[in-house]
Amino acid sequence: MTVQFAADKTNIPGRQLFRKWVGAALNKPAEIVIRIVGMQEGEVLNRKFRGKDSATNVLTFVYSDDVPLLGDIVLCAPVISREAEQQNKDLVAHYAHLIVHGVLHLQGYDHISDEDAVVMESLETKIITRLNYPDPYVIQQ
């Protein structure tokens, strides 16, 4: 696993935590690149690959679903920080959730249908709580 910091590293968890989170969500051998980007790169990637005119928190790119699984997870640091603040979530816990979310996407899970979303969110919650973080789908007051 490779972690690329293309954004200011302030308040971004370290490589060891990313490795721990990926390991908790992964069910097969993989070669994964995690890239943490700023707002500008986040906007460019989301526009190019999803047709959206703003940055999003996480993008996942699967290159091979064979063994080893090959893919990239792109995290937009400013979006993640803003969401954590708006949702009263611990920033590290939010990063953990988004990494788990991205790794599940790499393994073929999605949330396009309501049924698939229930399955994926249930897995995310199970993994995140096993890592001793709060359920990411419970609104914090």
UniProtKB/Swiss-Prot annotation:
Keywords: Cytoplasm, Endonuclease, Hydrolase, Metal-binding, Nuclease, Ribosome biogenesis, rRNA processing, Zinc. Its EC number is 3.1.-.-. Zn(2+) binds at H101, H105, H111. GO terms for cellular component: cytoplasm. The keyword Repeat does not apply. Its cofactor is Zn(2+). It comes from the Bacteria. Pfam families: YbeY (PF02130). GO terms for biological process: rRNA processing. Binds 1 zinc ion. GO terms for molecular function: metalloendopeptidase activity; RNA endonuclease activity; zinc ion binding. It is found in: Cytoplasm. It is an enzyme of class 3 (hydrolase). InterPro entries: MetalPrtase_cat_dom_sf_prd (IPR023091), YbeY (IPR002036), YbeY_CS (IPR020549). Belongs to the endoribonuclease YbeY family. Single strand-specific metallo-endoribonuclease involved in late-stage 70S ribosome quality control and in maturation of the 3' terminus of the 16S rRNA. NCBIfam families: rRNA maturation RNase YbeY. This is Endoribonuclease YbeY.
